UniProtKB/Swiss-Prot annotation:
This is Probable glycine dehydrogenase (decarboxylating) subunit 1. GO terms for biological process: glycine decarboxylation via glycine cleavage system; nucleoside metabolic process. The glycine cleavage system catalyzes the degradation of glycine. The P protein binds the alpha-amino group of glycine through its pyridoxal phosphate cofactor; CO(2) is released and the remaining methylamine moiety is then transferred to the lipoamide cofactor of the H protein. It catalyses: N(6)-[(R)-lipoyl]-L-lysyl-[glycine-cleavage complex H protein] + glycine + H(+) = N(6)-[(R)-S(8)-aminomethyldihydrolipoyl]-L-lysyl-[glycine-cleavage complex H protein] + CO2. It comes from the Bacteria. InterPro entries: GcvPA, GDC-P_N, GDC_P, PyrdxlP-dep_Trfase, PyrdxlP-dep_Trfase_major, PyrdxlP-dep_Trfase_small. GO terms for molecular function: glycine dehydrogenase (decarboxylating) activity. Keywords: Oxidoreductase. HAMAP family: GcvPA. It comes from Thermotoga maritima (strain ATCC 43589 / DSM 3109 / JCM 10099 / NBRC 100826 / MSB8).
Amino acid sequence: MNYPYIPHTDEDVRAMLDFIGVSSIEELFSSIPVSARSSLNIPESRDEFSVFKQLKEISEMNNSLEDYAVFLGAGVYKRYVPTVVYDLAMKPDFLTAYTPYQAEVSQGTLQALFEYQTMVCELTGMEVANASMYDGATALAEAALMSFRLTGKEKVVVARSVHPEYRAVLRTYLEKRGFTVVEAGYDETGRVLLEEVDEETAAIAVQYPNFFGIIEDLDYVRSRSGNALLIVVVEPVSLALLEPPGSYGADIVVGEGQSLGLPMWFGGYSLGIFATREEYVRQMPGRLIGQTVDQAGNTAYTMILQTREQHIRRARATSNICSNHAHAALIAAVYMSVMGPDGLKEVARRSYNAAHYLQERLEEIGFKLCFSGEFFNEFVFNVPEDYPDRWRKMMEKKILGPLPLEEFYPELGDTALACATEVISKEDIEKLLEAMK
């Protein structure tokens, strides 16, 4: 009898038993003591309808974010993604994260990635962008390594107001290789202090807006950087309203692209943004897609400047990224194309307004801001000592509340990081306020 995924028919089994000279499978395994045998406990086969029903019952044990008011940000955000984005991005023609080495059969994917790079450059104000990195944290680490190659120095100063998990990844990448990571503090506004920068500093890394939601003063940061390169970690949607880092003289811009049409996740499927100046392109990691003309004179797209990559000697390559998250970049390209400049500005504006309304309502019931600097769509505020317990109980009311910060910043005990995006309604905010009382 044939079974799906089991290649051996009854005739195959009989032929194998005859070949080795035994009459049955039981005889084949007769040398194994009965006491050592156990049943596989495999259930009887089931039809598709009953399997689907069982899987649906199991899936209903999960909680859906669609049912929650989400005030939890800190690098991953609940946003609305138009249905057309996945209708296009999930077409079988596109559905691979593999590198499009064969340009002649990958023109659609290559064009989409080229357009992604172009839109990232427009958002960041930079001259060249690659076709994606793994995520925001590893993009920052690669930016630091790039700064070492460009300057010949081995020290990076990173603001403590950069996402704590990004800083952890940075240390993992750098310290075992002998590089130095120094953290710079922050002031009462929530903005970075740069007292640690010296002539041995290869680069300064700041976040804009930073982990606390505060909009960093990049003019100040640039003025304090001296000869060090300026690395700016961005939240891409915010750049629809804020001045791009390139206009402040940033040398490398990196970030997490999850806000650009990707779902919320817990440790998976992500997108690293990476952009820089054209003069540094030979030291930029990752894939780069270029536009050219084929033999017939038609516009064509292909991977370019591959001598930076692992096609050359490993020791000379700028990075050794393999099958990267190209499909995530494609989704981001579709999302940005669908939204357009005005749509992205509207998403950013609604997020900004929702966060500021939330902050005002929290202040009305006694919750004060922790920092005085201007914020985008996240902010830190003071909370009572028992807030972590309240935070967990909020989940029972379908609320993912603001994030308690003491675990990440011991000096910020009894504070929380609140986030609001374009999907947060006044009703959601009132629901949170009631749970906070």
